[in-house]
Amino acid sequence: MKNIRNFSIIAHIDHGKSTLSDRIIQICGGLSDREMEAQVLDSMDLERERGITIKAQSVTLDYKASDGETYQLNFIDTPGHVDFSYEVSRSLAACEGALLVVDAGQGVEAQTLANCYTAIEMDLEVVPVLNKIDLPAADPERVAEEIEDIVGIDATDAVRCSAKTGVGVQDVLERLVRDIPPPEGDPDAPLQALIIDSWFDNYLGVVSLIRVKNGTLRKGDKVKVMSTGQTYNADRLGIFTPKQIDRTELKCGEVGWLVCAIKDILGAPVGDTLTLARNPAEKALPGFKKVKPQVYAGLFPVSSDDYESFRDALGKLSLNDASLFYEPESSTALGFGFRCGFLGLLHMEIIQERLEREYDLDLITTAPTVVYEVQMTNNEVVYVDSPSKLPPLNNIQELREPIAECHMLLPQEYLGNVITLCVEKRGVQTNMVYHGNQVALTYEIPMAEVVLDFFDRLKSTSRGYASLDYNFKRFQASNMVRVDVLINGERVDALALITHNDNAPYRGRELVEKMKDLIPRQQFDIAIQAAIGNHIIARSTVKQLRKNVLAKCYGGDVSRKKKLLQKQKEGKKRMKQVGNVELPQEAFLAILHVGKDGK
């Protein structure tokens, strides 16, 4: 056991986590050169296309160190995006140490900090690594100082390497083996194994990634899930070297995978503890704190026949992604679907794309909203996650919106632009610290503004140098209103949005103008209106298509023309009473982009 090392790799987006993992796998001979490819751990197509890591992946390797001993390294490659931070915290729970990878050109960024603090809170040994020293812009001395300044860990002798060229990766491994403590645990105690992650395989059922904390798990053992008390047979178990390799047992301190032929998706929840049925452990291991979704959106299948398969797909996906929340919802405009909760907009995009790809569904998404806290006039407090559920205005005593605490790190020269952006987003500055050339800014910004397009705008105003990390702070009373969209006098529930009173006329006008371009012209006028309660704040009209009834009149009496026009008018009026308007899919997406184009 003293030769086992469990560690994660944490870093900001694009600082080279996955490339470093590739090199480590190569040095330890986990894959032959023929099987090796770039970013071998990013196995999802989506991850390869976007060049980001979404799921944490684990690998077990054997490394022969310079002291002649052979060490077993279990390491987990983690995502860097703020939307997937729960993946990181789950991975860290299975480790004793973490490699903090920092780009020697870019320096410390917000995500580096956030993930590093998570690791320190969990009492992990953090080993700083300066990556990308082959770049002409690399300045390892300055970055080492920055790490000490901002993060507060000693980085004077931090390992320097270039994961791309492979320089110094050997030193990283040596340092790892030296600094990261071996796992603690009692191999003879009753089995306790933590479920770090699980996913659904069409042939095997539920596959779980587990970390054995105490005891030993052997093939054929009867295991019990502590939270539900159900027992299963351990049919197959083993490790990833990134390939799935079968083993006969997983010893104390090891990380591996387990198949118990669980067909029920809820059979082995993430964060649960497994133990042996005949000799159970006293108590479960502390799991993970549940993450609360920050953004909600409705997802509806385009054709209602897909509803069943959509429900199954969501179930399988939520097994793999513990932070996805969903409940059934129905809408008059879109039929039956689900209200889903996500950690952020990127998360929402990824989930939608995975559903469409992996399960072959066509989906419509409604505009994302955050959760509002509403105090009713009878002092009851309700939480509203969709504009259509907002109670009537006369029943609301106070409406509170969620405020996010945003930590930003950026170079000094972009400070002005970023502050302007934060103020425009109704932000309040709470802290500002200078670290050399970097500025650490803390703002409290309404969550609704953060999830809309704050991240994109922050990146564009700072030319990509600013980085952001945010978390939910509290609910705060605010003057929010619901803007309804009426089409020919009928409310369309899927198009409603909740916005701040000051922005309402502007958001309403913009939405109405956008919709006007998207709804195809009909044989009669279509009035598109935006309203707060019964007060109309904006209107535009999609003009009717009409035949020129006067084409056959040459000269002649004006009353003849009037008669024809009058007749046409009456026909259109009749048509308008019976006609209904088809809304194209783009109309629902229009809401997403309100307030984006250069405003």
Curated annotation (Swiss-Prot):
Topology of this chain in the membrane: Peripheral membrane protein
UniProt cross-references to PROSITE patterns, sorted A to Z: G_TR_1 (PS00301), G_TR_2 (PS51722)
Domain tr-type G: from-to ranges: 2-184
Enzyme Commission number, as recorded: 3.6.5.n1
UniProt GO molecular function: GTP binding; GTPase activity; guanosine tetraphosphate binding; ribosome binding; translation elongation factor activity
Reactions the enzyme catalyzes: GTP + H2O = GDP + phosphate + H(+)
Single GO cellular component term: plasma membrane
Keywords: Cell inner membrane, Cell membrane, GTP-binding, Hydrolase, Membrane, Nucleotide-binding, Protein biosynthesis
Source domain of life: Bacteria
Compartment(s): Cell inner membrane
GO BP annotations listed: positive regulation of translation
Any matching Pfam family: EFG_C
CDD domains from the UniProt entry: EF4_II, EF4_III, LepA, lepA_C
Role, per record: Required for accurate and efficient protein synthesis under certain stress conditions. May act as a fidelity factor of the translation reaction, by catalyzing a one-codon backward translocation of tRNAs on improperly translocated ribosomes. Back-translocation proceeds from a post-translocation (POST) complex to a pre-translocation (PRE) complex, thus giving elongation factor G a second chance to translocate the tRNAs correctly. Binds to ribosomes in a GTP-dependent manner.
Family stated for the protein in its record: Belongs to the TRAFAC class translation factor GTPase superfamily. Classic translation factor GTPase family. LepA subfamily.
Protein name: Elongation factor 4
Organism: Cronobacter sakazakii (strain ATCC BAA-894) (Enterobacter sakazakii)
Taxonomic lineage: Bacteria, Pseudomonadati, Pseudomonadota, Gammaproteobacteria, Enterobacterales
Name of the encoding gene: lepA
